Amino acid sequence: MSRRKARPARPSGSARTARPGGSASSARPRTAAAPAVTADSPCPCGLPAAYGACCGRFHAGPGTAPTAELLMRSRYSAFVVGDEPYLLRTWAPETRPADVDFDPALRWTGLEIEETGDGTAFHQRGTVTFRARFTHDGSPGELHERSRFTRHEGAWVYVDGDFLD
């Protein structure tokens, strides 16, 4: 991760801070005060499945997302639920930060996948272009990014991304 911008900690994860327009702060808790999501709740990633059967299975277990898009979705859900260990585990070693700084005033409210490039079981690299909606202190916002993914030791990991707006 060669570039870091003061933007929301992105669902794909390429910024360390979780504050729109803010900076990382070590005084913040390392876990977000996330909304209650249970195994039976609708999955935050937007697929028509319960969290436990969708992204929650990747968060809880040793299984890995089989495509770059599913990794993107599971990382978005990890931001929603404040799952720092999963985010760090699915981050490419060469760009992984020491920690993820969640902003308790930030709430992720929706994910739209616009486009995927490669990123299947037959590829070593892939891209996912998405829009992630959020509120910060009640004000709405949106993050538009093209994220890059690669395989590391056989599993998909997030590398970095480019802001599109």
Where do the PLM segments sit?
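Short Lys/Arg-rich cationic patches that frequently serve as NLS/NoLS or arginine-rich RNA/DNA-binding motifs
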Residues: M1-A32
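Intrinsically disordered, low-complexity acidic regions enriched in Pro/Ser/Thr
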Residues: S2-R7, G46, G138-P140, E153
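Short Cys/His-rich zinc-binding micro-motifs
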Residues: A36-A49
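Secreted/processed peptides and extracellular or luminal domains of membrane proteins
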Residues: A49-Y51, A60-G61
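Cysteine-centered loop/knuckle micro-motif
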Residues: A53-C55
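Core segments of small alpha/beta cavity-forming domains
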Residues: A60-D99, P104
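Surface-exposed, charged secondary-structure patches
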Residues: P104-E142
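Short beta-strand edge/turn micro-motifs at domain boundaries
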Residues: H144-D165
